[in-house]
Amino acid sequence: MAAPAAGPVFWRRLLGLLPGRPGLAALLGRLSDRLGRSRERRRRRSPWLLLAPLLSPTVPQVTSPPCCLCPEGVHRFQWIRNLVPEFGVSSSHVRVLSSPAEFFELLKGQIKMAKRRVVMASLYLGTGPLEQELVDCLESSLEKSLQSKFPSDLKVSILLDFTRGSRGRKNSRTMLLPLLQRFPEHVRVSLFHTPNLRGLLRLLIPERFNETIGLQHIKVYLFDNNVVLSGANLSDSYFTNRQDRYVFLQDCAEIADFFTELVDAVGDVSLQLQGDDTVDVVDGMVHPYKGDRAAYCRAANKRVMDVIHSARTRQQLLHAQTFHSDSLLSQEEAAAAGDRRPAPDTWIYPLIQMKPFEIQIDEIVTETLLTEAERGAKVFLTTGYFNLTQAYMDLVLGTRAEYQILLASPEVNGFFGAKGVAGAIPAAYVHIERQFYGEVCGLGQQDRVQLQEYWRTGWTFHAKGLWLYLAGSSLPCLTLIGSPNFGYRSVHRDLEAQIAIVTESRALQQQLHQEQEQLYLRSSVVTSATFEQPGRQVKLWVKMVTPLIKNFF
């Protein structure tokens, strides 16, 4: 009984951290009240959520001008640092990538230059020639590290999902075994296995579908002090013709340390791949599917939350040292010693969601951002798989901001043309899309909430995240980028991570705006005529099955 009880205690502690944030406090209260229940099972929409514009607090107006050291210009988002560490960086260290090819070349180049650490977290590693190129780059860098005149002791840590990474005779594990066998002291491969896939369920569900129960879905690629956050996996299509989003954080040591520790934490509660292709648990750790589930989840919660708390404490101390007057001398001394780093104009917040471990930070932050988006603000939200949670749908339909939601047309859905039952998944998404569009029209919200479908010949679409434009602004000041899809799986089943980037830099805002425009330019607006097209006719059995399976994809 200890595990369920831990949830409300966690929320009460968070409430104590949030004085003066009634909107966020209200959300935390709601999350606490519904702990242990599935809001997705409600048959009716909660009518009070449609009053969200009246219930949400007025966004405070910033009256003091921003200075070079204090993030007053983004004051309205500082509440996020009550939940997670806040990393202040210069926008010159942030670069937005635009294409799969650029992403692939960056990964290879960064691996080749790494001297100290390579940390990669992904759903899986593919088995084709492009993926082999990455493995070869890792092998070459490890070899060079050991043979150099001054060995750099390069360490490689890879975190993948167990079910997806073990599928088929040739898989992620077999791709990485040569590295593990040749460099056993320098390579670690961790395979996360959800605690929810166990017992009879694990025996009965076919290999192709067992990943529906829960996954390691985090996508972080880290090289020394450089970090790539993305929604892209390590597979050939993500390097060629599967559109995603990517941001490159250069020379950001504190952020790199945080994500290294996060991947280490998840790795410690995962199965460890051995040189003979067997797996084992870390000494002293509860087995994820053979051991006691509650004990495993408690241990995993503690391991991950310790990383978040310690990083948050470190950043608070750093913030205090930077901004207090008694630290001015040390700043001058640092500058004289050659530390010429520009003052931060951009703030990075890591948002973690691991509902199996009762960690719901990303959910809290996302709901609060949607709740507090004022009239006149614009939210551009994109997901490769349009299957919003009920809470997110309620907030989109019930708040004041304008929404443009970008989703995949059936032809660029990753499941389009798949064999068997999976081939019907694009039709299920069309059905969900049509239902949501019907609600938008039924509420007379067509002018405020707009759906757009991405289409590109020969490509698939996997981009996710959002861009927030404050009222009266033509450029975004905040973006969310990472692995979550805003759907039931992301919130309830999988391990997810993304970052909130808040910036005052016009140059970075221009980068983010251009990224958004490039994606939306390849889309068309959804109207009632969209669903009358021949390819949009959904079979009756798909309509009947969709409500039963929508929480699994």
UniProtKB/Swiss-Prot annotation:
**Amino acids binding ATP:** 121-128
Which compartments does it reside in? Mitochondrion
Q: Where is the active site?
A: 217, 219, 224
Question: What is the reaction catalyzed?
Answer: a CDP-1,2-diacyl-sn-glycerol + sn-glycerol 3-phosphate = a 1,2-diacyl-sn-glycero-3-phospho-(1'-sn-glycero-3'-phosphate) + CMP + H(+)
Q: Its GO biological process terms?
A: cardiolipin biosynthetic process; diacylglycerol metabolic process; phosphatidylglycerol biosynthetic process; phospholipid biosynthetic process
What's in the GO CC field?
Answer: endoplasmic reticulum; mitochondrial inner membrane; mitochondrion
What PROSITE patterns does the record point to? Answer: PLD
The molecular function terms in GO held by this entry are: ATP binding; calcium ion binding; CDP-diacylglycerol-glycerol-3-phosphate 3-phosphatidyltransferase activity
Name the pathway it acts in.
Answer: Phospholipid metabolism; phosphatidylglycerol biosynthesis; phosphatidylglycerol from CDP-diacylglycerol: step 1/2
Chief localisation class: mitochondrion
- Activity regulation, short description: Activated by calcium and magnesium and inhibited by other bivalent cations.
Q: Any idea which residues bear Phosphoserine here?
A: 46
Name the UniProt key words of this record, in alphabetical order: ATP-binding, Lipid biosynthesis, Lipid metabolism, Mitochondrion, Nucleotide-binding, Phospholipid biosynthesis, Phospholipid metabolism, Phosphoprotein, Repeat, Transferase, Transit peptide
Keyword Kinase annotated: no
UniProt feature coiled coil, ranges: none
Keyword hit for Transit peptide: yes
The PLD phosphodiesterase domain covers which part of the protein? 212-238, 457-490
Give the stretch annotated as transit peptide in the record, renumbered to this chain. 1-25
What EC number(s) does its UniProt record assign? 2.7.8.5
Q: Where does the sequence pass through the membrane? A: none
Q: Briefly, what is this protein's role?
A: Functions in the biosynthesis of the anionic phospholipids phosphatidylglycerol and cardiolipin.
Please state which protein family the record places this protein in: Belongs to the CDP-alcohol phosphatidyltransferase class-II family.
Protein name as annotated: CDP-diacylglycerol--glycerol-3-phosphate 3-phosphatidyltransferase, mitochondrial
Give the species this sequence originates from: Cricetulus griseus
